A protein has these predicted regions:
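Extracytoplasmic ligand-binding site segments that recognize negatively charged/polar headgroups
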Residues: 19-24, 62-63, 67-204
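Early extracytoplasmic/lumenal segment of secretory-pathway proteins
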Residues: 10-76, 206
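Paired acidic/hydrophobic, glycine-rich loop segments that form the ligand-binding mouth/hinge
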Residues: 63-67, 198, 215-220, 235
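Mature extracytoplasmic/periplasmic domains
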Residues: 251-312
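Conserved C-terminal helix/tail region of periplasmic/extracytoplasmic solute-binding proteins
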Residues: 308-338
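Periplasmic-binding protein-like
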Residues: 95, 110, 182-191, 228-254
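A ligand-binding cleft/hinge motif common to bilobed small-molecule-binding domains
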Residues: 73-75, 216-233
Length: 338
């Protein structure tokens, strides 16, 4: 937790997610940034850009700085629900390409991967182990239960398109029409009888694998690495994974807008980001963090932002989400309610 709000007159309400991700941010970023900047923070969980949009619409904004996936952030920005970033206050001059926009500043690079029970299918890279989205869909070659995303369309359609055999560089072109979006959803519909659990959060992804409740699952690489540390028999591949970033947005009309912008500037500095890989295997967005981190070569090579992994992945296209997310989400929710 940040410094108690009683110490300072103002406190920035920072909203992230729970589980190992929120703990990693507290340990690497928030606690020290609050202490060093003198800006108190109130930490809340349950971050959601849908909630941000509702707060902005109702004129009752209570959050100041909200963590979000890049696609949700782009959709909220397109809806006019976010403040423009003041780049005089938030220095992104050393950030990796495509890890910030005018409304969202990247905090970490992560990957949406598919993971599996290694007792059932073998260690990653071993003969016969799954290695592609086509394998995730192939219930004859890899019989067993699946788990897929339930409450959001971010990262849900692209795997289905790649499972159809569309090359990664053509995925967003395929999804640029309603027909393409519907075909992707039909592909997920095909798998639905084998999906025994739909997950709702990163904490749930980790728990499902710790409990060996499902055999194969989509989710975020860092959650699976932390589950493995906790004893889960889990492995994954970066092949065809979606390279994405989480970022911070400031809701339009945030009660402590200026202070939130200052805190965002502080937390984006390399000295905080350099600590993140020790707590979760997500890569810093600030290039300087890689120069000053004391992380081992082995740990750095496990990050989605490492050059040896980047080429295997599909970079998430933020513009596609800004234009198509609303329709894609509506159609995906229809599928889930069938």
């Amino acid at each position: 937790m940040g410094a108690a709000s009683a110490v300072f007159a103002d406190a920035v309400t920072v909203v992230s997610w729970g589980g190992s991700y929120g703990k990693a941010q507290d340990a690497a970023l928030f606690t020290d940034a609050s202490k060093n900047s003198g800006i108190a923070i109130n930490r809340e969980s349950g971050a959601s850009m849908s909630k941000v949009m509702l707060q902005v619409e109702s004129g009752a904004v209570t959050w100041d700085l909200v963590v979000s996936g890049s696609g949700s952030c782009a959709a909220a920005a397109a809806a006019g629900a976010l403040e423009k970033i003041d780049f005089d206050v938030v220095d992104v001059s050393n950030f990796l390409p495509n890890t910030y926009t005018d409304y969202c500043v990247g905090s970490d690079v992560f990957a949406t991967v598919f993971a599996w029970n290694t007792d059932k299918y073998g260690e990653p890279g071993s003969p016969g182990a799954p290695n592609s989205w086509a394998d995730f869909w192939d219930v004859e070659k890899f019989p067993g239960t699946r788990s897929y995303r339930s409450n959001n369309v971010d990262g849900a359609l692209e795997p289905a398109v790649m499972a159809m055999g569309v090359p990664p560089e053509k995925v967003y072109e395929f999804l640029s029409t309603e027909d393409g979006i519907r075909k992707a959803i039909d592909k997920i519909r095909e798998l639905k009888p084998h999906i025994s659990v739909f997950w709702e959060s990163g904490a749930m992804q980790a728990q499902l694998m710790k409990d060996a409740e499902v055999d194969m699952i989509t989710g975020w690489n860092g959650r699976f690495d932390n589950a493995k540390k906790d004893g889960a028999r889990v492995g994954y591949t970066f092949n065809g994974a979606l390279r994405d970033y989480d970022g911070f947005g400031i809701p339009k009309g945030a009660p402590n807008r200026d202070l939130a912008m200052k805190f965002l500037g502080e937390v984006s500095k390399p000295e905080y980001q350099a600590n993140l890989p020790f707590h979760i295997t997500y890569g810093p967005t600030n290039k300087e963090a890689y120069e000053i981190t004391t992380a081992s070569k082995e740990l750095l090579e496990a990050l989605p932002s490492h050059p040896k992994n980047v080429g295997k992945m599909l970079a998430v296209e933020i513009d596609w989400y800004a234009k198509n997310r609303e329709l894609a989400l509506e159609l995906y929710m229809e599928l889930l309610s069938e």
